Curated annotation (Swiss-Prot):
InterPro entries reported in the protein's UniProt record: ATP-NAD_kinase_N, ATP-NAD_kinase_PpnK-typ_C, NAD/diacylglycerol_kinase_sf, NADK
Catalytic residues (UniProt): 64 (proton acceptor)
Entry-linked PANTHER family: NAD KINASE
Function according to Swiss-Prot or TrEMBL: Involved in the regulation of the intracellular balance of NAD and NADP, and is a key enzyme in the biosynthesis of NADP. Catalyzes specifically the phosphorylation on 2'-hydroxyl of the adenosine moiety of NAD to yield NADP.
Entry keywords, A to Z: ATP-binding, Cytoplasm, Kinase, NAD, NADP, Nucleotide-binding, Transferase
GO cellular component: cytoplasm
Single Gene Ontology MF annotation: metal ion binding
One Pfam family of this chain: NAD_kinase_C
Protein name, per record: NAD kinase
Species, as recorded: Oleidesulfovibrio alaskensis (strain ATCC BAA-1058 / DSM 17464 / G20) (Desulfovibrio alaskensis)
Catalyzed reactions: NAD(+) + ATP = ADP + NADP(+) + H(+)
Lineage: superkingdom: Bacteria
């Protein structure tokens, strides 16, 4: 998917002076090249404005947390996102603050190449009524409260009982989110082009429940079983809802996903190596040996 860079909407991390200053520099840079640009400080409580909905690209200035927050607001808009990293890890926000002019020059000259990403929709049903729902770009996590107690969950796929789980929690992650909380809990790395999602238990107790990958077309069901524990569901590590025994959490692939701008010279595998997810003891960047 290829697009021309004509209009840019810039979203900055909240209360971040460096992001605001960089956004002003970017606006001037784009204006000098005949590219329309507008700026907004990230506001999670509101929808993206009309300018963003008609933009060629949404630039996000911040870390991966800001990138996730803006990504949820952009699900289904058909407008690609590109992050400029002002945080620590920067797996989602790929462009460095020092290298933005070089990256954007190439995009202005060559246009945008976009990749599609899957998002998750989840809903909490209580006594047959939906009491909470949301969208996640990275993950939906069920976890315990302030006390160090395992939580009791009943799991199912497409209406078929899978098994019960006693654990500190459970992570349902998209391919995009596979490099986040899920990989720390022993979950699989999943290429972002795949239309699947992963289920990863957090410290399962006396249970041989291994991480698994489900097709995006499947429905994953989590029943909160009786127990003394507090249980919460959190989307992308940013919004939380308290659950009760008997609640049913249903997770499916969202009807529409989102788009990310592909950065020239940055592949999924180069990012895995650069961020330490994959180690290369023989020397970074060596070619794969040719088959004989």
């Amino acid at each position: 998917m290829h697009r021309e860079l004509k209009r840019v909407f810039i979203v900055t991390k909240q209360a971040h002076a460096g992001a605001a200053a960089l956004a002003a520099d970017m606006q001037a840079w784009f204006a000098a090249r005949g590219i329309e640009a507008a700026t907004e400080e990230n506001d999670t409580a509101s929808a993206l404005p009309d300018f963003a909905r008609s933009a060629s690209c949404i630039m996000v200035l911040g870390g991966d947390g800001t990138m996730l927050s803006v990504s949820r607001r952009a699900v289904g808009l058909d407008v690609p996102l590109l992050g400029v990293n002002l945080g620590k890890v920067g797996f989602l926000a790929e462009v460095s603050a020092a290298g933005w002019q070089q990256a954007f020059t190439r995009l202005a000259e060559n246009g945008l190449t976009c990749s599609e990403r899957l998002a998750l929709h989840f809903a909490v049903s209580r006594e047959g009524r939906c009491v909470f729902e949301g969208t996640a770009v990275n993950d939906v996590v069920l976890h315990r409260g302030v006390l160090a107690r395992v939580i009791n969950l009943g799991l199912g796929v497409d209406g078929e009982w899978l098994g019960d789980l006693r654990a500190d929690g459970l992570i349902v992650s998209t391919p995009t989110g596979a490099t986040g909380y899920a990989v720390s809990a022993g979950g699989p790395l999943v290429h972002p082009d795949m239309s699947v999602y992963a289920i990863t238990p957090i410290c399962p107790f006396l249970n041989n429940f291994h991480p698994m990958v489900l097709a995006g077309s499947m429905r994953f069901e989590i029943r909160i079983l009786e127990g003394p524990q507090e249980v919460y569901v959190t989307q992308d590590g940013q919004e939380c809802f308290a659950l009760q025994a008997g609640d049913l959490v249903t997770v499916t692939q969202a009807s529409r996903g989102l788009l990310f701008v592909a950065v020239e010279g940055s592949t999924y595998f180069t990012r895995l190596r650069a961020k330490g997810f994959v180690r290369d003891p023989r020397g970074r960047g060596r070619a794969v040996p040719a088959s004989s």
